Curated annotation (Swiss-Prot):
The protein's name in its UniProt record: N-acetyltransferase 8
Domain N-acetyltransferase: 62-217
Annotated organism of origin: Rattus norvegicus (Rat)
Domain of life (superkingdom): Eukaryota
InterPro entries: Acyl_CoA_acyltransferase (IPR016181), GNAT_dom (IPR000182), NAT_camello-type (IPR050769)
Bilayer topology annotation: Single-pass type II membrane protein
Taxon lineage: Eukaryota, Metazoa, Chordata, Craniata, Vertebrata
This protein's encoding gene: Nat8
Length: 222
């Protein structure tokens, strides 16, 4: 098992960070596709449309061709939310990581480095409108290279954010992750995060039934 250390993001890390983040998000597309195929409305579409064509035209060949056209469309539909999310991030906070995360004492961005390579990332920003009496920090961009998973890197990165939050006087750490990101969901539960709700990012994520899970980690008061 290769050793790693966690440090603050530096500008020279940018290309590696963005590349790892983008690839990590797009890795979820096959899972999203399988999830979409098992939805009742998808099964109805895959069975109903070809059957309707057979009843209207009497051609089974046309029905088979229809299925072959529907499957690439469903792949596109499953992948689009992830691609849209990556594009949005690269045009907002990830466009300038230093400006977004390192221009204020109450925020931060860290990388895990191993053998001179960036193998993990995590960021944190203060919540703009927290509940009354709370000071909350939101965890963002947790990602670990596929070749370095299972080594405790993600857990170490989350602990870095939790310790930073304690040092800065935050009352809670909050985050949002996708239902299909089961590795992340399991990690957060195992570290003591509590689920506070679910939501959908937009109509497309609702259509493909990819919900977002909201978590909170209350920090003990000093």
């Amino acid at each position: 098992m290769a050793s790693f250390h966690i440090r603050q993001f530096q500008e020279r890390d940018y290309e590696q960070v963005v590349d790892m983040f983008s690839r990590g998000m797009k890795e979820h597309i096959p899972t999203a596709f399988r999830h979409l195929l098992l939805l009742p409305r998808t099964l109805l579409l895959l069975l109903g449309v070809p059957l309707a064509l057979v009843l209207v035209s009497g051609s089974w060949l046309l029905a088979v061709v229809c299925i072959f056209f529907l499957l690439p469309f469903l792949w596109f539909l499953a992948g689009q939310p992830w691609k849209n999310y990556v594009s949005k991030c690269l045009h907002t906070d990830m466009a300038d990581i230093t400006k977004s995360y390192l221009s204020d004492r109450g925020s931060g961005f860290w990388v895990a480095e191993s053998g001179g390579q960036i193998v993990g990332t995590v960021g944190a920003l203060p919540v703009k409108d927290p509940p009354s009496g709370r000071k909350q920090l939101q965890l963002f961009r947790l990602s670990v290279s596929s070749q370095h998973r299972g080594q405790g890197i993600a857990k170490a990165l989350v602990r870095t954010v939790l310790q930073f939050a304690r040092d800065q006087g935050y009352t809670d750490v909050v985050l949002v992750t996708g239902l299909l990101q089961q590795g992340a969901v399991t990690l957060y539960y195992s570290m003591g995060f509590q689920k506070t709700g679910e939501s959908f990012m937009d109509i497309l994520t609702w259509l493909v039934d990819v919900s977002l899970i909201h978590f909170i980690y209350p920090l003990p008061s000093s």
